[in-house]
């Protein structure tokens, strides 16, 4: 087989605005790139997804399936055209890749290259190792290549046996964009299967261990994903089965240790109702469920605590840390992956409702707040920052000098401090803490988080790349409870319409769902559903909130539109009918509205 020079490209880390919020996109959604749109990235069903196209030209699409499945199609048969689509698990660079005792991946795919301009393509496991706080360890982009067309590496390597198959392993140096932001020279690690295939099991952790045996530096694991990539080519990859897991099938899962992503987070909603506990040597659980990150943590000074996950981002935390230097936290929200500066996000909103109280104290305190970090990846002169937007507190008022500002119609005192301690980078260092403290306490409401970032920037405070936005319950030498019954984090303001991806309207599926319709009903506002929210299942639901978009209810711990959804006039003007069931199954959404299927033809969902 001929040897062709192969160009490995990393997707430049720019998050498409419409793809964040509420945990990302949903099954059945088709994301497209081309004509100036180069990337979509987010989380759906508990699995990360990304589609990326170089700005050299071409086009492509990625349709999300249930779980981690997806279908990718690309046409990048142009000079230096490069496309990729991948799904998997984000591990958040919490610990070294070889510290995970087991990571497995099962997949089935149909993959073929349909065109080429002296190019190539491949189907592979893909990810990164970050060198957070690890001296002498390189930044690494890794590939476990299972199938390919028109490419065989000519690099010197070594043959190893993993999962009963022969793989050639080698490494290269590459200069280009990275997940840290900017461009730099980094390592690429490869395992290339000598017998191609498009389905099977991969013990990913065995590849990491084999690379380590060769003396290759192993950093903190950022992600494990199945990737379809094309260079100056066109093709299709239909991944009909994909599972990534950290507990070997047939074995009993061990308790989660510090920094471990629980295997239960891999399946989207499988951890709903699960109670995580800390104490007696167990000090942390961390992962993703229902598209939202979660963490419970307890200092090793003593005490205990628990966190019970609800649907969406909701949770209940209870803690007993009324001991000397006892410290507890529990939080849920969205991970933004330090992809770009916090102030580069036009809008980030957070809605919440909680019952919060401190039940005991050993000269301690507690607080309910929005919490996160700014990382200083590739940003000279910008500090590492831990930030707090404090909404309610007990037995704590900072005496720091600050400035009063008005955000969301309320007064906040803003100030910063220096602090030395453990960080998300690993190890201990001195970093900045930014604070916004609400002067009128509350336990529910709306927070325009992005306005706090912008206000801090106005003061000349350094703003780094946004790592996360989470609602946090924290106790210091205290005991208490926080029951968060409503929590939503989103990047499209309510009342605006997020971008949609075009898709062909072709289907042979039919479905019927019946639901009685009250004689007297209100119409659910199209301005609400245009933001991705559903209409409440009860057309006569209780109205919690009213604004220019319509009337808002709450269902399954998330916002919904009160009333029956309207059938779009843009659909009926094309000659299609409104579906006879006003609560029909939505097969497709575009600028015209929501489309259902009835009698083997398209119809408009609503009434």
From Swiss-Prot:
Domain GH11 span(s) in chain numbering: 35-242, 280-487
EC number from the UniProt entry: 3.2.1.8
Domain of life, source organism: Eukaryota
Keyword terms, alphabetized: Carbohydrate metabolism, Glycosidase, Hydrolase, Multifunctional enzyme, Polysaccharide degradation, Repeat, Signal, Xylan degradation
UniProt signal peptide: 1-18
Biased composition (Polar residues): 248-272
Region (Disordered): 248-284, 493-514
CBM10 domain residues: 523-563, 566-606
GO process terms (BP): xylan catabolic process
Covalent S-S links between cysteines: none
Name listed for the protein in its UniProt record: Bifunctional endo-1,4-beta-xylanase A
């Amino acid at each position: 087989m001929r040897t062709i020079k192969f160009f490995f490209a990393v997707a430049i880390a720019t998050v498409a605005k419409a793809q964040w919020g509420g945990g990302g996109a949903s099954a059945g959604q088709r994301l497209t790139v081309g004509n100036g749109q180069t990337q979509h990235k987010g989380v759906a069903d508990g699995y990360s997804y990304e589609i990326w196209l170089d700005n050299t030209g071409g086009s492509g699409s990625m349709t999300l399936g249930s779980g981690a499945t997806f279908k990718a199609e690309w046409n990048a048969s142009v000079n230096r055209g490069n496309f990729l689509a991948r799904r998997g698990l984000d591990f958040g660079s919490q610990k070294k890749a070889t510290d995970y005792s087991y990571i497995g991946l099962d997949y089935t795919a149909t993959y073929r290259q349909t065109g080429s301009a002296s190019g190539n393509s491949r189907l592979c496991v893909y990810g990164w190792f970050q060198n957070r706080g690890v001296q002498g360890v390189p930044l690494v982009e890794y590939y476990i290549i299972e199938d390919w067309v028109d490419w065989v590496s000519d690099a010197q390597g070594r043959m190893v046996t993993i999962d009963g198959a022969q793989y050639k392993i080698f490494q290269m140096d590459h200069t280009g964009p990275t997940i840290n932001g900017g461009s730099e020279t980094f390592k690429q690690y490869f395992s290339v299967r000598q017998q191609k295939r498009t389905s099977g099991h991969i013990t990913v952790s065995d590849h990491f261990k084999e690379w380590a045996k060769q003396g290759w530096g192993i950093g903190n694991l950022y992600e494990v994903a199945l990737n379809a990539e094309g260079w100056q080519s066109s093709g299709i990859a239909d991944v009909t089965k994909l599972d990534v897991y950290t507990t070997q099938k047939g074995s009993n899962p061990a308790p989660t240790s510090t920094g471990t992503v629980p295997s239960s987070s891999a399946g989207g909603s499988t951890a709903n109702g699960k109670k995580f506990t800390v104490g007696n040597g167990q000090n942390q659980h961390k992962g993703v469920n229902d598209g939202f990150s979660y963490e419970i943590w307890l200092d090793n000074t003593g005490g205990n605590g628990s966190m019970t996950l609800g649907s969406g981002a909701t949770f209940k935390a209870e803690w007993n840390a009324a001991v000397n230097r006892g410290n507890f936290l529990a939080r849920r929200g969205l991970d933004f992956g330090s992809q770009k500066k916090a102030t580069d996000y036009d809008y980030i909103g957070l809605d919440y409702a909680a019952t919060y109280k401190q039940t005991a104290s050993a000269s301690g305190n507690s607080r309910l707040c929005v919490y996160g970090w700014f990382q200083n990846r590739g940003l000279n002169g910008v500090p590492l920052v831990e930030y707090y937007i404090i909404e309610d507190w007990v037995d704590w008022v900072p005496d720091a000098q600050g400035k009063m500002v008005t955000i969301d119609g309320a007064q906040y005192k803003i100030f910063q401090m220096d602090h030395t301690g453990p960080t998300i980078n690993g190890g201990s260092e001195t970093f900045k803490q930014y604070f916004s403290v609400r002067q009128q306490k509350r336990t529910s409401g709306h927070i325009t988080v992005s306005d706090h970032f912008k206000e801090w920037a106005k003061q000349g405070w350094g703003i780094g790349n946004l790592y996360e936005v989470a609602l946090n319950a924290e106790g210091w030498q205290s005991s208490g409870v926080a029951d968060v019954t409503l929590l939503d984090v989103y990047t499209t303001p309510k009342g605006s319409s997020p971008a949609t991806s075009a898709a062909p309207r072709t289907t042979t599926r039919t479905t019927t769902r019946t639901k009685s319709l009250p004689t007297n009903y209100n119409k659910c506002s199209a301005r609400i559903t245009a933001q991705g929210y559903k209409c409440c299942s009860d057309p006569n639901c209780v109205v919690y909130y009213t604004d220019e978009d319509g009337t808002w209810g709450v269902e399954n711990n998330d916002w919904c539109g009160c009333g029956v959804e309207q059938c779009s006039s843009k659909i009926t003007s094309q000659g299609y009918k409104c579906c006879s069931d006003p609560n029909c199954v939505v097969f497709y959404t575009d600028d015209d509205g929501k489309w259902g299927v009835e009698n083997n033809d398209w119809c408009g969902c609503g009434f």
